Amino acid sequence: MPKPSRGPRMCSGPDHERLVLANMSASLFLNKKLRTTEARAKRLRPFAEKLVTLSKRGGLHSRRRALSILRNKAALHELFTNIAPLVEDRNGGYTRITKVGFRSGDGAPMALIELILEPVSARTRGTDTLPDTVTDTGPDSAPDPVPGSEPGSAAGDLPDADTAPADPGESSSNQRVIR
């Protein structure tokens, strides 16, 4: 007997769950946001994002497949004519889920799921980590000395491992212990 792979059903059965997800995604496409429970928002996200990806392909076949899932011509028109061109440059991640508190009646955690219609920011990788000026870091350039590492300074007073006393019973405050 087949079992649900994504945990327990949101509603009474698989057919009813598909209808609820279709109605919720139609409301999401028409209103651009939807306030629902956290569990329903998490189940709606992949369902709606697959429909947005389908609408980005365009074409009659994609439109008919989306209509067979959505069953709402107004939402289908909104999805294909208004939403798809806005998310054309975005590769996934078309929705955002924001937790908004708890429902007053039964204390269920509520969430706001909304479409991300802003254009993708044109960031270049690594520009925020590079310094403004680049210095010569070739093999001939020596690294800057670390402060306190000069001979005679406090950090340079430790004896080398070769010059440490050979007798283990002899203790010194500057003795380096090798383990």
Swiss-Prot record:
Residues 123-179 are annotated as: Disordered. It comes from the Bacteria. It holds the Pfam family Ribosomal_L17. Part of the 50S ribosomal subunit. Contacts protein L32. InterPro entries: Ribosomal_bL17 (IPR000456), Ribosomal_bL17_CS (IPR047859), Ribosomal_bL17_sf (IPR036373). GO terms for biological process: translation. SUPFAM superfamilies: Prokaryotic ribosomal protein L17 (SSF64263). It comes from Tropheryma whipplei (strain Twist) (Whipple's bacillus). Gene3D superfamilies: Ribosomal protein L17. GO terms for cellular component: cytosolic large ribosomal subunit. Residues 154-168 have a biased composition (Low complexity). Residues 170-179 have a biased composition (Polar residues). PROSITE patterns: RIBOSOMAL_L17. This is Large ribosomal subunit protein bL17. GO terms for molecular function: structural constituent of ribosome. Keywords: Ribonucleoprotein, Ribosomal protein. Belongs to the bacterial ribosomal protein bL17 family.
